[in-house]
Amino acid sequence: MLYEGYLKYMKAKYGERSQGTYFMAGEDLISKLPDSLITQILLYLPIKDIVRTSSLSSRWKSLWLLIPRLDLDSEEFQDYNAFVGFMNKFIDFSGEEKICLDKLKLSSRKTVNDLPCVTRWIDFVVRRKLKHLDVECLVNRKFLEEMPLSLYVCDTLVNLRLHRVLLGKFEAVSLPCLKTMRLEENVYANDVVLESLISSCPVLKDLIILRMFEDNVKVLRVHSLTLTSLNIDFNFGEGDDFVDGFDKKVSGVLIDAPRLKYLKFQDDLSGSKIITNSGSLAKVNVVYVFNENDCADVVDIPRRNMVRNFLTSISGVSDMKISQHFVEFLYYYKDFDPLPQFCNLSRLKAEISLYFLEILPTILESCPNLKSLVMVLEFYLQEEDEPIIFSSVPRCLVSSLESVEIKKFNGRPAKMEVARYFLENSGVLQKLVLHLRCSTHEDGFYILKDLLALPRGSSTCRIVVC
């Protein structure tokens, strides 16, 4: 057991040539190693084997408590009671000895009849200067366990992930070292709890919020002076009992993070979306934000202004990815308001279906300095023979676009017309990259032959097929 752990340690540290020289002539030389090295070796063993080492001798009795990382999954135990028993023994034993736990990952899957115990465990470890905490409770939202008050004032936490837990009210919150926080499908006492949790992290850099329906948060407010990366995802959860009558009009998202550089936004459930102080924003990934109903009501001027302001707030980025759903929204939006100018945008990745492909020149016209374009063409088979006519040639095709990459390209008429459009009208294009999808090598040969026969606006353009 120890020898296997030793070999894994040596292989990880020194590579394949390392030799197991600490077991020679039946002599146990590992026990003579310093505690710090033994604990590193123990990390390469399953948790059950790590605990078993405590029975080897008095030298080993409490060594396993010195391991800096602990990864526990209730599924790896005989049943949930065995899992609970192990954790209780760990806490009892740790109360008598000084533990050096730096990182804890805890995954709990329990049924209705299983007793709650995660709260007590988390309270125990965060009081002992834990730095990295990952808690995953895979239960129905009716049986979520509440996080202890001690978690909100842990002055050593650097990374925190909470999945399907309850965050209740607290009198104080202070997480002075927390840099990364991932909150997934949790339930909160109210809006203030989540807002205060975020704003009370003075060095927070990365924040991910995956919300579920009925999480008790009407308006998500993200206020942070240090945040550089933000991912917001609000969808209907799986396996939950949903409550009818969700009021979109009173729900919203407010982001005020002046140092924010990266934003991924996937939320079409909230009614209002507002971003302020977005001057540092450089990269966005827009999945779900709006739909055609958000701009079709010409009477609802405040709502149309909200949509316009959101688009303007992300218009200064240099790198943008937009989903098929967002392209569909822009298709309808163009009939009511012009798109803002994305003058700094140099890289764009877009998922586009044939039905909304005519919006492509309009999108490109709003990106006058675009250099790189990646397109994922999501066409249905029956659409691929439909004729396509592009109405205009945007400025970026003439003066700045250097690289075009088309994924899911099969040479059918509709997709061939897209390739022709860029080859013929791009004045400074350096390369056209096509990710070819065809059933035979012969089909690929004829597709490439047709591509090479197309006229080119740039004499230096290369066609790359992969």
Swiss-Prot record:
Pfam families, alphabetized: F-box, FBD, LRR_At5g56370
Entries under SMART domains matching the protein: FBD, FBOX
PROSITE patterns, alphabetized: FBOX
Cysteine disulfide links: none
Superkingdom of the organism of origin: Eukaryota
InterPro entries (alphabetical): F-box-like_dom_sf, F-box_AtFBL13-like, F-box_dom, FBD, FBL13/AtMIF1-like, LRR_dom_sf, LRR_FXL15/At3g58940/PEG3-like
Name of this chain's protein: FBD-associated F-box protein At5g22730
Organism this protein belongs to: Arabidopsis thaliana
